[in-house]
Regions:
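Long, charge-rich intrinsically disordered scaffolds of nucleic-acid metabolism proteins
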Residues: 95, 396, 402, 407-477, ...
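Short, ordered loop/turn segments at secondary-structure junctions
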Residues: 36-38, 127, 236, 318, ...
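A glycine-rich phosphate-binding loop feature that marks nucleotide/adenosyl-phosphate handling sites
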Residues: 176-183, 316-320, 374-379, 398-405, ...
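Low-complexity, acidic/Ser/Thr- and charged residue-rich accessory regions of DNA metabolism proteins
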Residues: 140-149, 205-206, 244-271, 275, ...
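Short beta-alpha connecting loops at secondary-structure transitions
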Residues: 17, 338-345, 368, 408-421, ...
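Duplex nucleic acid-engaging cores and interfaces of nucleic-acid transaction enzymes
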Residues: 45-51, 58, 62-315, 319-419, ...
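Accessory alpha-helical DNA-binding modules that contact the DNA backbone or grooves
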Residues: 29-30, 45-147, 337, 476-615, ...
Length: 704
């Protein structure tokens, strides 16, 4: 039944879901399933496999909750056959909780106290609505604990209010009305005007619950978390009350007055607060999912940024008072030299700094400069551009986001125990240019600076989603097993931290891996981990050329057949494009291997050893713009997209503050999502449309 529910929810065929769920339950990873098990899934991509896994996890949690509910009600002796059937056929978490509510163990309530005083029968009389002499009948319930008939009726109404609050239809009425017509309303907490000035837009703001944007809702929630705002849901209480009265009060009711009071009390004290909490939690989950989705996509783009490749780099972490930290890295990213120069105020040793950089560039045959884009970045760029170096030496501005986090991390201390954080930070900047993916995996994704309200969303869900993105990117690119750090190996399908460390330790003790099969000699790396990981690990220059491809070892025999059929060797087949063009994939389809896998094999042979990431392009900011004071409305400037949100994109134009291109200014057409128009790292041309110097805000447009 689980697979059928998933298929219905996702609009994916049942056989595809069944095949995917079976593999997931066997311990297969999302990258492995989507890359190497296309016959089992009907060629589902990573996003679809991930969606199935998410639904499977949710339904597994629901099943566990269902068993708890059944056990609790059965323990009370109240589990009828009909009730069991309803619970077992329920696949909605909210509905399950509504069914369970009347049986759920409760803390002491007003209704509990009334029952303990023997007022349940009186509640039945009031709800029967036939007693025209209720006060006289209530007299029978006056005791030492119940002083008057009026007190007895009040207690009975407390019981009725609780019964109404536990009625599924009543809760659905309130839920439906508040959900469809309610508005999220934020109000300022009295006396917090000055402290909460940044939330001034939300001091008295309302947005329809059904359509409130994720960034607006999360801003309200953050204001509430900081004690500045109070959030509630406005709804038509009168209409809801009328609907509840129609359900619980009969025409000609003899106890209408008391029933109306019980309905009003139930709505105000019990149902509405409960449903409001539920709806706000659902809105928070929806907003979280949207914000996490934006963050995840930004992270994916950043991790897959174009690498410079294996080139010798001089990396500079710029600064004024403390100087610029300079490191020289070889083509593998190893640190070979470091120093500090002081070209900027207050020291101003410009000529000395320039000569130092010229000497380093010549001595180490530098092929590129990587300059951090933070404080003093543009000034340092000017310095390097004025060195008069060979035109073949390229210059790149590199984001510093996360570099300081890495430099102070355990990973950095382990790698560079004898260097301080400033040297480590410069190394990270240089390596981020050489290979962004290999460097960024060492940093907590939340520190990379491409999120939207990342500190306001569910942190567990955020971490899981970002880890999935990192895993996806690492496996998409693949890693060289003989040069990969334990940090990047951790994200390879089927490995994890322990096996990654074991691989690095084995490599240190035994030298480079000669082939993929040698992985099976790594301690604790068994057949299952090998199956999941092997296709994503590359052995460059080993004794089997297929080990430097995306072809899985389980399919090597197919390539060998292709070579034999062509009357050649595997080496020749890999080297000769014309031989590969003559391959007819359908000839190699059998009961074990389908056309999707064979097609992937042929494609992998064509792309063997190629990096799927784009080529890196050089870029220069406008040389006349260094501060917000240099900007004028109407200026057209080159820029780089640094962050994408639901409401637009932030663009670095070469000054301290990034400018915002609002979604309405991204194109001369309607844009539903900024991702339709831009991606991280994209070079764009923008026009300055607004400058708020006091608040450091810059408005930009990409419209023609």
């Amino acid at each position: 039944m689980t697979e059928r529910i998933i298929a219905q929810r996702l609009g994916i065929s049942l056989p595809q879901v069944q095949g995917t769920v079976r593999l997931l339950r066997e311990g297969a990873t999302i990258p492995f399933i989507s890359r190497y098990r296309k016959e089992a899934t009907g060629s589902l991509d990573e996003l679809q496999v991930g969606a199935i896994k998410e639904q499977l996890d949710r339904l597994t949690e629901l099943e566990a909750r269902r068993q708890t509910v059944l056990a609790t009600i059965e323990g009370q002796g109240k589990l009828t056959g009909e009730l069991r059937k309803r619970i077992e056929e329920c696949w909605d978490a909210v509905e399950l909780e509504d069914i369970y509510l009347p049986y759920k163990p409760k803390r002491r309530t007003r209704a509990t106290a009334a029952r303990e005083r023997g007022l349940e029968p009186l509640a039945d009389i009031v709800m029967a609505q036939r007693a025209h002499d209720l006060l006289r009948q209530a007299q029978r319930f006056v005791t030492a604990e119940v002083a008057t008939p009026e007190e007895a009726i009040a207690g009975a109404c407390d019981i009725i209010a609780e019964r109404i609050s536990e009625d599924e239809q009543a809760r659905n009425t309130v839920r439906r009305t508040m959900g469809r017509e309610g508005a999220v309303h934020s109000k300022l907490v009295k006396g917090k005007e000055a402290e909460g000035a940044k939330y001034s837009d939300y001091f008295d703001a309302a947005s329809p619950l059904r359509s409130i944007s994720s960034h607006r809702f999360l801003a309200m929630r953050r204001g509430e978390d900081e004690g500045i705002l109070r959030i509630s849901i406005d709804a038509d209480t009168e209409r809801i009350t009328e609907a509840l009265c129609r359900r619980f009060i009969r025409p000609g009711s003899a106890t209408r007055t008391y029933m109306e009071a019980a309905v009003a009390d139930s709505l105000k004290r019990l149902i509405r607060p409960s449903i409001e909490t539920e709806l706000l939690a659902a809105a928070k989950e929806k907003a979280d999912d949207e914000a996490i989705g934006v963050f995840a996509e930004n992270l994916r783009q950043l991790l897959l940024s174009a690498p410079l490749g294996q080139k010798r780099v001089i990396a500079i972490d710029p600064g004024f008072r403390t100087g610029c930290k300079v490191v020289v890295l070889d083509s593998q990213g190893n640190l070979v030299h470091n120093t500090t120069i002081y070209p900027h105020p207050p020291q101003g040793r410009y000529a000395e700094a320039a000569e130092t950089l010229r000497a380093l560039a010549g001595k180490y045959r530098a092929e590129a400069f990587a300059i951090g884009d933070g404080t003093a970045g543009r000034e340092t760029e000017q310095l390097v551009r004025g060195l008069g170096l060979d035109g073949a030496v390229e210059l790149f501005m590199v984001s510093e986001d996360g570099a300081s986090v890495y430099s102070a991390s355990a990973a950095a201390r382990e790698e560079f125990p004898d260097y301080d954080v400033t040297v480590r930070g410069s190394v990270s900047i240089g390596r981020r240019l050489i290979d962004p993916l290999s460097e960024l995996v060492k940093i907590d994704p939340k520190s990379i600076g491409v999120g939207q309200y990342q500190h306001s969303v569910d942190q567990g869900k955020l971490k899981a989603r970002l880890n999935t993105v990192v895993e996806s990117c690492v496996n998409r690119v693949g890693v060289n097993i003989n040069t990969a750090s334990k940090h990047i190996l951790t994200y390879i399908s089927g490995l994890g931290p322990a096996l990654a460390e074991n691989i690095v330790a084995y490599r240190a003790a035994n030298g480079d891996f000669k082939n993929r099969k040698e992985l099976l000699r790594v301690p604790r790396l068994g057949a299952k981990a090998y199956e999941q990981a092997a296709g994503f690990l590359r052995v460059v220059g080993g004794n089997n050329p297929l080990d430097n491809s995306a072809v899985h070892p389980e399919s090597y025999h197919i390539v060998e057949r292709m070579a034999a059929d062509a009357g050649t060797t595997v080496d020749r087949l890999l080297a000769d494009k014309e031989l590969r063009k003559a391959i007819k994939p359908e000839r190699y389809v059998d009961g074990q291997v389908g056309l999707p896998t064979v097609t992937d094999i042929v494609e992998a042979l064509d792309k063997r050893g190629l990096d799927p990431r784009e080529q890196l392009q050089a870029f220069s900011f406008d040389p006349g713009v260094h501060t917000i004071g240099d900007l004028r409305e109407g200026m057209t400037l080159p820029g780089i997209v640094t962050n994408i949100t639901a409401f637009g994109a932030f663009v670095d134009i070469g000054i301290k503050q990034d400018g915002l291109v609002h979604i309405s200014q991204m194109a001369d057409r309607y844009v539903a999502s900024p991702a339709e128009v831009v991606h991280l790292g994209q070079q764009v041309e923008v026009r300055v449309t607004g400058i708020d110097t006091a608040r450091g805000r810059i408005s930009l447009s990409m419209r023609k």
